[in-house]
Amino acid sequence: MLSYAPENAYQRASTMENKKVFPKEKSGLHPRNRHCSRYDFDALSVSCPELIPFLAPTAYGDISVDFADPLAVKMLNKALLKHFYGIEYWDIPADSLCPPIPGRADYVHHLADLLASCNGEVIPKGKNIALLDIGVGANCIYPIIGQREYGWRFTGTDIDSHALSAAKMVVSMNPTLKNTLRLKQQKDPHAIFEGVWAVNERYDATLCNPPFHGSAEEAAATTRRKLHKLGKNEVAAKPVQNFGGKNSELWCEGGEEGFVSRMVAESVAKAQNCFWFTSLISKKTTLPAIYHALRYVKAVEVRTIEMAQGQKVSRFVAWTFLTPEQQAAWVAERWA
């Protein structure tokens, strides 16, 4: 067991007085989420010894990493992916998005429930189930989790060639991903599906974590607020993203609302080639505009699935153009 004892008796007594009792499980996470319990840093350090230098005692007497340190967050993710998902090699460029894995896993599990709701409450599994990850990034988080949990096959797209190069290395170094994750570059920064979705390709679902902000300035302001909440009161003029992120990952013209609205518009051309289109929606205020866009394109069915990670509430919107009869035919052909 790892030990991080205070230096003297006074510190030990002070630490015990300040020790905060945390719940054993994180509230709100999906019941199948492997991260419902608090991080077991002893076990994670056994799986990934590189994590050990980033561990330190907190003011409350437990052990954690500095979530304002991008290297610490990256190493925590590396340890989680190795310990829970069997990923032997995982590395991303310093300026790439390093997302919190528990929340990403929740999206995958709730998406599995969405598919199950159309299949007699049975989750369709295996390589016959094909998903399209828009903005896969260097981290490949959704394909890693989806393949490990449900055996799904993924196509991941991105506009960033450097991110895709890093993603290709992750795929090549992990046998479980070699035949289950295909990567494509989106060469048109204004397109989402066009150019990466062949005419004859069919997907059981799409998923996406869209750029959140409408400008680089807005993204930087959000970073400063996050660092302040983490106790970093002296914030640099150009702060480092604690979870990383290049411009294309963090912001785009029109922000989240503009990006997802364009996705809705493009989905019409692929209406019969996909069962469920989905996208995360971080801002609740974005929903009315997305619902309006979906009414305009005459989506047959729209669902909003809420997720909670502690006090944070997020959701994804799902839509389909398939009628109930077409849905039944799809299930019989692909999921039986």
From Swiss-Prot:
The gene name on file is rlmF
Q: Does the keyword rRNA processing apply?
A: yes
Question: Which HAMAP family does the record associate with it?
Answer: 23SrRNA_methyltr_F
Gene3D superfamilies with a match to the protein in the record: Vaccinia Virus protein VP39 (3.40.50.150)
Q: What is the lineage of its organism?
A: Bacteria, Pseudomonadati, Pseudomonadota, Gammaproteobacteria, Enterobacterales
Q: What is this protein called?
A: Ribosomal RNA large subunit methyltransferase F
Which species is the source of this protein? Answer: Yersinia pestis
Which Pfam family, any one of them, does this sequence belong to? Answer: Methyltransf_10
Q: Which UniProt keyword terms apply here?
A: Cytoplasm, Methyltransferase, rRNA processing, S-adenosyl-L-methionine, Transferase
Q: What does this protein do?
A: Specifically methylates the adenine in position 1618 of 23S rRNA.
